[in-house]
């Protein structure tokens, strides 16, 4: 923990337990103690001599920020536990893997890149729309896509009151009955691509996230998890902070 004072929710996030937003919720739910006293506001500054507990358990010591790239297979969810007992990507982690959270999410049927980190502040940085990171997806649909279809998808439609901004969409390949598309979005709203294509009666057969900002799926095998080298992670975080307005 750093010597200078910082907001308590930020310190909780840095410990890898959850995001800053979730830390603030825990505080408002009166599940957080500071120096053995329950608190109810996140507007508190703490330093490295303070003791922070969640549900009466002391938070872990802040570790060096790390992140991993995971190729999520279809059929897995991205939360750590599930009332329906569906498989989660956390079951893919080795037993001695550090405590991590996901950056963003993918629905159960979507494959591809999901980023894991032990730092909730990094997760916040990469998730926020203000950061402006592009997400690129490879999508197979049950249709021979026409130029008119592309025009409609690029129109950034409003579906059920939610506006979806499509940065780009291009045809990779197609047959008489199927098309592979590459779609780029920025905000990563819940089920964004599925909602956009469904709005235009285009059925998805496969949806694969290829990249998230500067981080690429590349040749990572399904179910495989690879740590981002420290020097690369440090450089990318520095560049992202330089060109974003997030504080």
Language-model features: locations:
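Basic, flexible Lys/Arg- and Gly-enriched helix-loop patches that mediate nucleic-acid binding at interfaces
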Residues: 1-247
């Amino acid at each position: 923990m750093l010597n200078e004072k910082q907001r308590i929710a930020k310190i909780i996030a840095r410990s890898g337990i959850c995001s800053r937003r979730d830390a603030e919720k825990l505080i408002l739910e009166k599940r957080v103690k500071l120096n053995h006293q329950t608190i109810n506001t996140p507007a508190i500054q703490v330093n490295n001599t303070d003791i922070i507990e969640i549900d009466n358990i002391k938070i872990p010591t802040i570790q060096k920020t790390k992140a991993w790239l995971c190729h999520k297979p279809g059929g897995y969810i991205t939360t750590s536990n599930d009332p329906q007992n569906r498989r989660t990507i956390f079951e893919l982690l080795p037993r001695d893997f550090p405590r991590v959270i996901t950056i963003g999410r993918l629905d159960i049927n979507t494959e591809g890149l999901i980023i894991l980190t032990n730092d909730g502040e990094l997760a916040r940085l990469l998730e926020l729309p203000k950061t402006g990171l592009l997400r690129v997806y490879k999508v197979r649909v049950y249709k021979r896509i026409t130029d008119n279809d592309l025009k409609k998808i690029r129109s950034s439609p409003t579906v059920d009151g939610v506006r979806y901004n499509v940065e780009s969409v291009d045809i990779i390949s197609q047959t008489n009955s199927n098309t592979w598309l590459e779609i780029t979005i920025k905000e990563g709203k819940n089920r964004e691509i599925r909602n956009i294509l469904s709005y235009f009666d285009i059925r998805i057969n496969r949806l694969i996230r290829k990249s998230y900002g500067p981080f690429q799926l590349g040749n990572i095998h399904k179910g495989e998890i690879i740590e981002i080298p420290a020097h690369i992670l440090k450089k990318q975080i520095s560049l992202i902070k330089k060109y974003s307005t997030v504080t």
